[in-house]
């Protein structure tokens, strides 16, 4: 299987990256340094993770040590929902670049299709606990994203958590300059996303799978939630290949021609998660893993369920 996938702008994106969502600032610098030393070249970041400065420290250290050159790294970040207004997009991108200590990003994504009221709160809520929307349209936000490419701040642009109807609106935008290169979505055996992936691939859009292990460290986990890592059926498949459950869960999207970004701050796990290119799941095991779909989401963003651009109402 390819260790890179080609984006629609001709650049190559490593199929395995290090996720940094929920990585504590005190641990993420070391995690990124360890990952780069082990061979990771793709790091997935976002302003809302509130740890980009610490990621930047690690990147600078490895660049200074000449462990890697900048052109060998593939750095992704995301525009947060409170910055969807066209006038705010460039400033948000520049803040990320400054925190990461970089001149450009390889890929910049609209993190969610939902625009939020601008201000200091990442999740501005009303008295009922619903998010306060902004008067913005992600199609207009996309125009500002395109300008970032023209100005050399980012090499490629894409989306995250968008459904096919929302992507279609961007593709049909009058005067579209750049198609989305990537759609980053939650994807694992309990949420296989077959229709959405088929749609994206059909449009030449690469799909990145986040939370491939089911995000066991999510703060809102409930005891009764299903656990991918503890699923005896997946453990059984892993034993057959002499691999860990995590390695099977990371290999699964790679064989579906997806990019995958498991998160860890533990050096042993960061290493384990990278050892997925020396085995191949059989067609039968791939089909079995796909059959475990139950449309179960780690990241349902329920506080936005009433937002006009909430992406998960329609199974389209």
From Swiss-Prot:
Keyword Acetylation: yes
Keywords linked to the UniProt accession: Acetylation, Cytoplasm, Lipid metabolism, NADP, Oxidoreductase, Phosphoprotein
Subcellular location: Cytoplasm
Sites where the protein binds substrate: 111
N6-acetyllysine: modified positions: 95, 222, 263
EC top class named in words: oxidoreductase
Location of the active site: 49 (proton donor)
Sites bearing N-acetylalanine, chain numbering: 2
Annotated GO CC locations: cytosol; extracellular space; mast cell granule; paranodal junction; perinuclear region of cytoplasm; plasma membrane bounded cell projection cytoplasm; Schmidt-Lanterman incisure; Schwann cell microvillus
Pfam families: Aldo_ket_red
Residue numbers binding NADP(+): 10-19, 211-273
Site (Lowers pKa of active site Tyr): 78
Role, per record: Catalyzes the NADPH-dependent reduction of a wide variety of carbonyl-containing compounds to their corresponding alcohols with a broad range of catalytic efficiencies.
Assembly with partners or alone: Monomer.
Family per similarity comment: Belongs to the aldo/keto reductase family.
UniProt protein name: Aldo-keto reductase family 1 member B1
Organism, as annotated: Rattus norvegicus (Rat)
Gene: Akr1b1
